[in-house]
Amino acid sequence: MGMRNIEMSAILTIDFDIIMAPSIELYNNLIGDQKGVNKIIKQFPLLEYTMTADFFIYEAITRELVKLFKRLPAEKVFFISEHHTLLKLVEDLDKFELFNVDHHHDIGYNKTTPTTKILRPECGNWVKYLSDKDRINEYIWICNDNSDMPTTGLHKAYLTEPINIKEFNFDSVRDIQKLIICNSPQWIPANIQALFMSWVGIAEEYYGKDFKIT
């Protein structure tokens, strides 16, 4: 990992779809704004048996979450459904380093270029939206082996560095202002959703309070 200002306030966000590396590319390009993976499964039921998660990544992140809960007070931990709803949670913060553990880079897709204005932030472009508002000091994307890299222009303009999830050191993230854990149900088969709820359950047991998924 390259040089960075470890004193800069940080947002660490984890998208649950990071555990779907073994199968997400089977349906990745079939999911539009209104069509989640479970709608695809309804049309093609046998697909569900091919949609597996990487349980090694799940287990590793679960261990890291327990360590993070020990570092952070409950008021710095949030669970959300859609990744772009993170925007409301960071409105009160100054510029920050953004660490995004995610199968997708969320800088923008299709014909998005550095000059494209994001009029409506959504799950695939919220990082660019924040950066264009001058809210991000550095963007560090923690991805899978088979994650699609952003186009060259977007990479140079927005991404400080991509890091493979298998090489990322969670302890390197200092001064975490908020830990935001995202469900992204449109990317997760229903039979795997229970694993996300286990993260919520661990947080609730540790902090002794209920967490809403907003």
Indicate residue ranges for each PLM-predicted region:
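Conserved alpha-helical scaffold segments that buttress catalytic/binding sites
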Residues: 2-214
